Amino acid sequence: MSDRPRRALADDEEPEEIPEVRFVEESAIPARRAAGSEDVSDQPTPHAARAMAQVPASGDDSCDELTEPDKKAGRYWKGPVWAVTLAVVALAMSLATSAIPPMQRSAVKVQPISSGRTLVCPPSQGKASLAAGSSGGSLQVGTSVEKLSEASVPVMTNVNTSAGYIRSTAGQRRPSGSALSSEGGMTTWVPCIGAATGGAVSVTNPSTSDLVVVNSDIRAATVDVTMLGSKGENVTAGMRGIRVSPGQTKVLPMSVWDNGTTPVTALVNAREGRVVVGARMWAGQGRDTSAMTQAAKTLFLPAVPAKVSTATLIISNPGTRRLSVSVTALAGRGPFTPDGADEIDIDPRSTIQVDLSKALAGEGVGLRLSADDPVIARLFVQGKPGTTDNALVSPGGSSKVLEQTVGAAGTLELSNPGREAVTFSGELTGTHGEKTAIEGTVPAGSTWSGKVPAAGHLHIVGSAPLIGGVISASGLAVLPLEAVAAMTNGRSVDVDPQLR
């Protein structure tokens, strides 16, 4: 046992076990004459650990070597005394520390590490503007990894039909962004996302759609594509080993693999590297661009627009066994189960569509999907009767903190998937630094809506998790808010291989 003082324990540490001191029985020690006080005072005081270690070995030879009885007695009685004394002192210090209230203890403050992050907006068909922002400071924006420039946020810049890039460096705030395209009354709004080794996108009509694969990495990527349709899995020639060069974008017409007109979901998996995948749909009735998402057992589709004429739920089962999905609508008057959506069965490796037009009755809602195994889902909506635009409502995260940078005015919808009312507050920071406060209460299982007056960075903080999105004021498009993970007392690091 060490003779140094024990340190105070932090709140999350377990107390160190103190070894029990065992005394040597008198019968185990050979009898010796007592030493006089003058003999003991002449000897140096031994270290406690050293004194405990100096127990003579058994045998006559070792006893004969101890020719100074006075020294022998001093070593034997001082060792245990020192050990017991130090043990008592250490125990007293430990008890005293535990008696101090937690607020009075000194603890090292752990500062969260803000690592760099790169986001990519898949390119749209029309001329698009990129909106990038964060809680403050500046970000790098541009149309490729090699063409980035520093800008104060929030910022708007034209990217036309190119992919939009947003990058933060170490120490900068967490970025968010979106790309908005609006031409001829048809609007697309797609979030900027981080690269991954795979993802899924869904379209209603593969004959008029294409995949867009963006490689924002510094090395080449090789991807495989699998399509899940109403008749099951579709793997045809040309869907394997597709190479995308570093910093390049590859457009893959889906009609080459499936020329049908029923919904399909494309699963894109990168054998090498990381990619960002988008899907672009165009037709006489409108256009839309969506970004890849991941399968999950619980999915949220926030900000379903009100007064739409068509609402079709597209669900895919990427697994190998049949599963069941239930749908709950979070509406202004409270939660309800849409007719025909209480239990939806889906065969493995297939995609189905469920018409919710009458069940939702044109009400603005958020949807929650629950399944036995991970599923993929989106909601296809068409505008008011007589309009031509459409949109895909994509999944959004549930969190106490929601953020997004929007490129235009719109309607904010927040839904509460919990069982208790949620109060929230936040603000919209405009492109010129002006701030607009946003606050309210969302009852349990309900949806709240309010105006987003202009472009800017939107930051919402709730008393409990919320889901949300912004619906465009012009045309028909829905942009999901990004869930921001709550900071913990530790380091949170996102490693970006592009930051060398």
Residue map of PLM features:
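Extracytoplasmic/periplasmic/luminal assembly and interaction segments
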Residues: L130-T169
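Terminal targeting segments of Actinobacterial cell-envelope proteins
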Residues: S2-K78
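Intrinsically disordered, low-complexity Pro/Gly/Ser/Thr-rich segments with frequent PxxP/GP/PP motifs
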Residues: S144-N160, E233-T261, P335-G362, T431-H457
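Conserved functional hotspot residues at active sites or interaction interfaces
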Residues: D70-A131, S176-V213, V275-P318, V375-E420, ...
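Short, aromatic- and glycine-rich surface loops/edge beta-strands on solvent-exposed regions
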Residues: T161-P175, T262-R271, G364-D372, P453-I471
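Hydrophobic alpha-helical membrane segments, chiefly transmembrane helices and signal peptide h-regions
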Residues: G79-P101, A266-V268, V325-V327, L367-L369, ...
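Short acidic, flexible loop segments centered on an aromatic residue
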Residues: I113, T118-L119, V213-V235, A270-R271, ...
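Long, internal scaffold/assembly segments composed of regular secondary structure
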Residues: A295-D373
